[in-house]
Design a protein with these regions (language model features):
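N-terminal secretory targeting modules
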Residues: 1-59, 240, 244-247
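Residue-level detector of flexible, active-site-proximal loop/helix-junction positions
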Residues: 26-29, 103-105, 170, 213-215
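Short, flexible, glycine/charge-rich loop motifs used to bind or transfer phosphoryl groups or to couple energy/partner
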Residues: 46-49, 87, 115, 153
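Short, flexible coil/linker segments at domain boundaries that flank nucleotide/cofactor-interacting
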Residues: 51-53, 91, 158
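Conserved SGNH/GDSL esterase-like catalytic core that processes O-acyl groups on lipids
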Residues: 55-59, 65-146
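Short glycine/proline-rich turn/loop motifs
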Residues: 62-64, 217-218
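Alpha-helical cap/lid subdomain in secreted, periplasmic
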Residues: 114-249
Length: 249
């Protein structure tokens, strides 16, 4: 499906749900109240593994899953678990840095988080983006435009890095989101997933992890929205297993 068709589908879908928009707003507020707000994980930097060569550098940047909501420390969250997996693959130490913030979209990642990135070159960059572009109803055109800009910034500043991108959220599996808001957001998440698959295809050393079909969601959730420590471990392992097929470590 072309970008224009996705955009048209998004606009028509918005028009269709407009009559129940007040109900959806109330439903969303109630769900947010039920979920509450988890704290960020502690210790956003670390080193894992060992090897004869100097440590490689991994940057993990993005939304609440990058901030580690649902885990006690980043070592047990997405950043640390991804670094552990990379270290095992390259048989070398990985120096990892996490920059995450709850609620950020791709645009806010550019504006608010990228200025915080250390002035150094990274060998690997993992973008944990997409959940809030779904939750905050970014259109397909906005999603593509902002992600292409973010990928371009990463590439311009880290020309030799491999860029990995986590999947758009698996909202359909969330045990806390009620219908009809779950179905509406899931349809948008699937649309953003297909969109990013299309526009990253053929990009040099840019790898997107499509919405998975092989993740066991038993014990995955901390609060119904964010992963638990087990969820982060399983998620990172599944992503890296997918990247193994497309990236030569």
């Amino acid at each position: 499906m072309s970008l224009n068709k996705w955009q048209a589908k998004f606009i028509l879908g918005g028009a269709a749900v407009l009559p129940i928009a007040p109900f959806l707003y109330i439903q969303g507020r109630i769900t947010r109240w039920k979920v509450g707000l988890l704290p960020d994980a502690a210790d956003p930097e670390g080193v894992v593994g060992q090897g004869e060569a100097p440590p490689v550098k991994l940057l993990v940047i993005g939304e609440s899953t990058v901030a580690g909501l649902g885990a006690r420390t980043h070592e047990l969250a997405l950043g640390g678990q991804s670094a552990k997996g990379v270290s095992e693959r390259i048989n070398n130490a990985v120096n990892w840095t996490v920059i995450g913030k709850n609620g950020v979209t791709a645009r806010r990642t550019i504006d608010e988080l990228w200025p915080l990135v250390p002035n150094e070159k990274f060998d690997y960059v993992l973008l944990g983006i997409g959940g809030n572009d779904v939750m905050k109803l970014s259109s397909p055109k906005k999603w593509r435009r902002d992600m292409l800009e973010l990928i371009g910034i990463v590439r311009d500043t880290n020309p030799d890095a491999a860029i990995f991108i986590s999947n758009c959220p698996m909202i359909i599996h969330s045990p806390i989101l009620p219908q009809p808001i779950k179905g509406i957001l899931w349809n948008l998440s699937k649309m953003h997933n297909a969109n990013i698959i299309e526009f990253t295809a053929g990009m040099d050393r840019v790898h997107y992890y499509p919405q998975p079909v092989d993740v066991d969601f038993e014990g995955f959730w901390a609060d119904g929205i964010h992963p638990s420590e087990q969820g982060y471990r399983d998620w990172a392992a599944a992503m890296l297993k997918h990247f193994d097929k497309h990236h030569k470590w």
